[in-house]
Amino acid sequence: MAYAPIIIKEPKVLSEDQGRCRRLRIGLGARVYSNRLFEEIAHFFDVHPEIEVTFVTEAGQDFFVPMREGKLDVAIDRLPPVQLIPDRGGFVSWPLIRERQCILMAESDPRSRLTGMTFQDLQGCAVITGLENSMEDRTLKQECRDFGVTLNRIYRSDGIETDMKLLRKGMGVIIGPESFADYYHVAAVPLVPEVMVSLDFICLKKNANRPEIAALRKQLAKVCKEKAPCE
């Protein structure tokens, strides 16, 4: 009896039939772009056309609420302070890239020549952050409470480009990652004592083993290990 040859193909994350009704909604923090990671994310979906993707990129967005409500599947962003995440036990996260947290300022700012600044050095300063009650804004307020710092003024916006224009004009400073300096052409003075913050892959625990989520996480972990291994 003759048998048909067996052809083995590289499996897709999802079958074509599943892919037509399967969507992946991803929240992206600004650190994704400053660490040149968006190109890798886009490439993943280029080779997996069976997954329909939507990106949410609002600056300072609280991604945890829409994930909990089932409106978002994954967030790739920094983790906020523990006390700002209710029901944190329902989420799981994996660090992708770790970098120093800095005080960002205009390159013309005299303080840009310093080798380090403490959070207390922000006393009486103007700071640029996200919209009121956004995760970015609440994180700033929490840090000010923790260090007993009173700011002189706060500028808020919902766009990172607006934030950076304010920064370059010397209107205030931003607390952010070291990678912003090169990406946005601003100065970065490291916080002292050193504060390391990671860009994390975050999702609900119950969704962690979904094939498309697991595949994306593993691919990004591989890429980031080559870029800047997490210790």
Residue ranges and their predicted role:
Residues 36, 190-231:
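A late-sequence structural motif
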Residues 35-37, 78, 125-147, 209-210, ...:
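Secondary-structure junction motif
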Residues 39-43, 61-101, 105, 185-189:
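Short beta-strand-centered segments that line the small-molecule binding cleft or hinge
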